[in-house]
């Protein structure tokens, strides 16, 4: 019973306390806001703190009221002290937060708003800096791009113009020479694309500045290759270099003769400067024409021309009246004429020394003509080369008819034997080294085959066979040495 009365008293106290707390709210207060605010009671206590009056204005009251006031003042003082401590803690937390570094991107344009909202007299005045000239949006800022685009356009225009001009010059040459070529050759313009030879009647373009034409079907020769080598007019850099060093367009004609239609000799005529260069570069001229180019003034040719010949008889036989006429009247267009039964092209330069075999030779007539105009050739200049093609046709017939006498033939044969002997002497050491290398490789392969044999009996038989072969080689060498000694005695 006593326990029940105590519980009832405690519950009544709790209900009365809750009712008193509820009475503290105004009608306008938000209950949820009060529940969420943990420090609401401290704020209410601060609001209800009594204001102290001066001692002169205080009215004496009863002792009970004075004691009650003292207790309330002590409670208010405690509450105010707690609130002040809480405010100090919050201020310390805010100071710590201010001390921490913050991200500039998170507070972008924050300083600008502060400056516009609260003007500061201590800030420096705003100064507008001039934009540098190279950053301004004007045509002067793009001078490099303008130069590059201009250069590219100039290169493209030069390529188109140069390519078209080379094509026009080649077509002009062919139109002026077509009738002569078709009257002397049954096949004109074979491109080699078909198994059977077919006359296309047109030039073959190798690239933008070289045009080819193959003609065949004529007596005395296997065929004739014509090459039109124009200046690289499509290349702007080449055009600029020609301003410092002018060059000419060239027409090169190579006639391959039949073996029975040309005798054994080497002959060349042309400008002195060109012959000196060819004598150094060409294999046949350097071997069979050891003398320096001789002047052709005795034969009625201009002073600028010279002659290289294996024998004097060849010069007298080739340089007849008609050939002298062609060379004299068209000396400004003729750079070189080269007749050779030992033609193999330029010298072969190898890093490891001389080649072990003589180069393959063919009986060839080689003509090199310069197009007039000094690099500024026109259609009329290409048509003016027609008489030189007549000279080529005449030279083919002339070479077929010309024959050396008996002494000249013997001298030519001696010269060829001498050249071959000199070549063998030069390459003798290299051929010995090559033969020794082949023998060593053969022995090494034989030893490897014996070592790889798994059957001991078969391996022994192979070793005995190899020894017998070596013994036979030694006996043969000894027999040769004995025969040489007997002949010497």
UniProtKB/Swiss-Prot annotation:
Q: Output compositional bias ranges, type Basic and acidic residues.
A: 436-478
GO terms classed as biological process: endoplasmic reticulum calcium ion homeostasis; multi-pass transmembrane protein insertion into ER membrane; protein insertion into ER membrane
> Which keywords label this protein?
Coiled coil, Endoplasmic reticulum, Membrane, Signal, Transmembrane, Transmembrane helix
Biased segments, Acidic residues type: 33-47, 62-103
Task: Please give the superkingdom of this protein's source.
Answer: Eukaryota
What's an example GO cellular component term for this entry? multi-pass translocon complex
Q: Which residues cross the membrane?
A: 142-162
The record places the following residue ranges in the Cytoplasmic compartment, namely 21-141
User: Which residue ranges does the entry give as Lumenal-facing topology?
Assistant: 163-489
Q: Which family would the database say this protein is a member of?
A: Belongs to the CCDC47 family.
Protein name, UniProt field: PAT complex subunit CCDC47
Gene transcribed to yield this protein:
ccdc47
């Amino acid at each position: 019973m006593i326990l029940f009365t105590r519980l009832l008293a405690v519950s009544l106290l709790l209900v009365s306390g809750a009712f008193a707390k509820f009475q503290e709210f105004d009608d306008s207060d938000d209950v949820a806001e009060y529940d969420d605010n943990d420090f609401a009671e401290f704020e209410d206590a601060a609001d209800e703190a009594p204001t102290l009056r001066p001692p002169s204005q205080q009215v004496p009251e009863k002792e009970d009221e004075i004691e009650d006031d003292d207790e309330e003042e002590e409670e208010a003082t405690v509450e105010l002290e707690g609130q002040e401590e809480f405010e100090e803690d919050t201020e310390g937390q805010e100071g710590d937060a201010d001390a921490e570094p913050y991200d500039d991107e998170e507070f972008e344009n924050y300083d600008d708003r502060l400056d516009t909202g609260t003007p500061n007299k201590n800030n420096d005045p705003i100064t507008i800096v001039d934009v540098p000239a190279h950053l301004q949006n004007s045509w002067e800022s793009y001078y490099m791009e303008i130069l590059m685009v201009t250069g590219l356009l100039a290169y493209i225009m030069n390529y188109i113009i140069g390519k078209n001009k080379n094509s026009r010059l080649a077509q002009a040459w062919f139109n002026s020479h077509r009738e002569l070529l078709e009257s002397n050759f049954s096949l004109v313009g074979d491109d080699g694309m078909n198994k059977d030879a077919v006359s296309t009647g047109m030039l073959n373009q190798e690239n933008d500045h070289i045009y080819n034409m193959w003609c065949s079907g004529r007596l005395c020769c296997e065929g004739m290759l014509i090459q039109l080598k124009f200046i690289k007019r499509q290349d702007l850099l080449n055009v600029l270099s020609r301003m410092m060093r002018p060059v000419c367009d060239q027409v090169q004609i190579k006639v391959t003769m039949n073996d029975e239609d040309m005798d054994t000799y080497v002959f060349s005529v042309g400008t002195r400067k060109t012959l000196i260069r060819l004598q150094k570069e060409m294999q046949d001229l350097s071997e069979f024409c050891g003398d320096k180019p001789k002047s052709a003034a005795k034969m009625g040719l201009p002073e600028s021309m010279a002659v290289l010949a294996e024998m004097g008889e060849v010069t007298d036989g080739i340089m007849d009246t008609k050939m002298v006429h062609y060379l004299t009247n068209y000396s400004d267009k003729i750079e070189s004429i080269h007749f050779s039964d030992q033609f193999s092209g330029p010298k072969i330069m190898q890093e490891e020394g001389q080649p072990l075999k003589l180069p393959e030779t063919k009986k060839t007539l080689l003509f090199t003509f310069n197009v007039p105009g000094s690099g500024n050739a026109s259609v009329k200049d290409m048509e003016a080369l027609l008489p030189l093609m007549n000279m080529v046709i005449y030279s083919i017939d002339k070479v077929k008819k010309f024959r050396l006498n008996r002494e000249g033939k013997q001298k030519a044969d001696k010269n060829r034997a001498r050249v071959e002997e000199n070549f063998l002497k030069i390459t003798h050491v290299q051929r010995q080294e090559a033969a020794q290398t082949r023998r060593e490789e053969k022995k090494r392969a034989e030893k490897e085959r014996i070592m790889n044999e798994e059957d001991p009996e078969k391996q022994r038989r192979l070793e005995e066979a190899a020894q017998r072969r070596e013994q036979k080689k030694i006996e043969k060498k000894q027999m040769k040495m004995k025969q040489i000694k007997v002949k010497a005695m």
